[in-house]
Curated annotation (Swiss-Prot):
Keywords: ATP-binding, Ligase, Nucleotide-binding, Purine biosynthesis. The keyword Nuclease does not apply. InterPro entries: ATP-grasp, ATP_grasp_subdomain_1, PreATP-grasp_dom_sf, PRibGlycinamid_synth_ATP-grasp, PRibGlycinamide_synth, PRibGlycinamide_synth_C-dom, PRibGlycinamide_synth_C_sf, PRibGlycinamide_synth_N. Coiled coil: none annotated. ATP binds at residues 137-189. It comes from the Bacteria. It comes from Helicobacter pylori (strain J99 / ATCC 700824) (Campylobacter pylori J99). Residues 111-312 form the ATP-grasp domain. One of its GO terms (molecular function) is ATP binding. This is Phosphoribosylamine--glycine ligase. GO terms for biological process: 'de novo' IMP biosynthetic process; purine nucleobase biosynthetic process. The gene is purD.
Length: 424
């Protein structure tokens, strides 16, 4: 594919991260048209939402719309090989290969991969037998982390709680469950652009995953986040590069596994004998809500340049420039999130001062200009500022511009690093 200044771009996904990516790409005069499979109620104002019946249909539509670049930010299409299908059709793709996507698709595969790489991670017990699992937890120290299927991660504090989760998990799938000790420390989300054997780290982010203030309640995909989470030395960043990302890419290359996209490492920083050490918790092979919305405002380069350099395997030609500002994001969620669905609710949105931040539309639908909630994390309030405290104030000011029945959000995002005594 020749370079041009007239790109048709396809984004595969329908959450807040896709809206965030499109919002930035739309500002690039080189982007001729934006298409979405399937998109959401917000993306239809930024481009064209396409009805995609199956993955072969996505390829057909991509050819019909003369797509120059496809960005896949949903997990399932990566796992099922959409990257390879589009590449076979001659389309440039920003997205992990099917084989690389196993790092996120299977907890069992990921733990074995990490162990072989010598990457520091929690010790673990793996089984698909309920009796074996129960025997293990009877002799284990709590809290424990139970990982089932690809996304279901639970922190449990007693045997009764663990039993219910194990029973439910092993009834749903033949995939083994992973049981780990809970690692106490400072958690970070580290996102990297990956072009086979090359990578570039984006600003560090801290995701507040628990549903309730004070980090209580169930785990979610993320109730808020802050960036940059640069509270550590350059030495720690080098450890993350050299002890987590480099061994991962070296093994992928040794296994002839192509990867041109995003790798997000969830890391916990633990103090060992007075030295800070990064331990890997999980991998994701795509941009994630809420990290994507939080770190993108810090990237001053045109996003199209990032995607093209990655997809072409030319990261060496990219010199990233990051803003000196801070960003905080707050998820505005439906009443029953994350345990069950909620009835659709009409959204009422007041004007936002764009000097202070912006809104990212997530699980929403739109009909004749009226927005309705269609899922759990409905809208994200993004605040920017010269300090983290200023970014926080702006994020919560913007959150108050949104109204819908049953809306809920955490009011303590950033408490781990700010002096919010009410929640510490």
């Amino acid at each position: 594919m020749k370079d041009n200044n007239n790109y048709n771009v396809l984004i595969v996904g329908n959450k807040g991260r896709e809206y965030a990516l499109a919002q930035r790409l739309q500002q690039d005069e080189r982007v001729n048209a934006l298409y979405f499979c399937l998109g959401n109620g917000g993306t239809q104002d930024l481009g064209e939402n396409l009805e995609c019946e199956h993955y072969e249909h996505i390829v057909e539509l991509a050819l019909k719309k003369q797509i120059h670049l496809a960005i896949i930010s949903e997990e399932e299409p990566l796992i099922l090989g959409l990257t390879e299908m589009l590449e076979k059709a001659g389309i440039l793709v920003f997205g992990a290969s099917k084989e690389a996507a196993k790092l996120e698709a299977s907890k069992s595969y990921m733990k074995a991969f990490v162990k072989e790489c010598g990457i520091k991670s929690a010790s673990y017990f793996e089984t698909n037998d309920l009796k074996e699992a129960l025997n293990y937890i009877q002799n284990a120290s709590f809290p424990l982390v139970i990982k089932a299927l690809n996304k279901n991660t639970s922190i449990v504090h007693h045997q009764e709680e663990a039993l219910k989760i194990l029973e439910d998990a092993l009834k749903q799938s033949n995939e083994p469950v992973i049981i780990e000790p809970f690692l106490e420390g400072f958690e970070l989300s580290v996102t990297a652009l990956i072009a086979n054997d090359d990578f570039i780290l984006l600003p560090f982010c801290q995701n507040y995953k628990r549903l309730l203030e004070g980090d209580n309640g169930v785990n979610t995909g993320g109730m808020g986040a802050i960036a940059p989470a640069n509270f550590f030395s350059n030495e720690l960043e080098e450890k993350i590069k050299n002890h987590i990302f480099k061994p991962t890419l070296e093994k992928l290359q040794a296994d002839n596994t192509p990867f041109k996209g995003v790798l997000l490492a969830e890391i916990v920083i633990i103090e060992e004998k007075g030295v800070l050490e990064p331990y890997l918790l999980d991998f994701s092979v795509r941009f994630k809500d809420i990290e994507c919305q939080t770190i993108l405002p810090l990237v001053e380069n045109p996003l199209l340049d990032l995607f093209l350099a990655t997809a072409k395997g030319e990261l060496h030609s990219l010199e990233l420039v990051f803003s000196k500002e801070f960003v905080m994001s707050v998820a505005l969620v439906s009443r029953n999130y994350p345990t069950s669905s909620s009835p659709k609710q009409t959204l009422y949105i007041d004007p936002v001062d764009e000097k202070k931040g912006h809104l990212i539309l997530g699980e929403v639908e739109q009909d004749n200009g009226v927005f309705e909630s269609s899922g759990g994390r409905v809208i994200f309030a993004i605040g920017r500022g010269k300090s983290l405290l200023e970014a926080r104030n702006h994020a919560y000011e913007i959150a108050q511009k949104v109204h819908f029945e049953g809306m809920f959000y955490r009011k303590d995002i950033g408490f781990k690093v700010l002096d919010l005594k009410e929640y510490s």
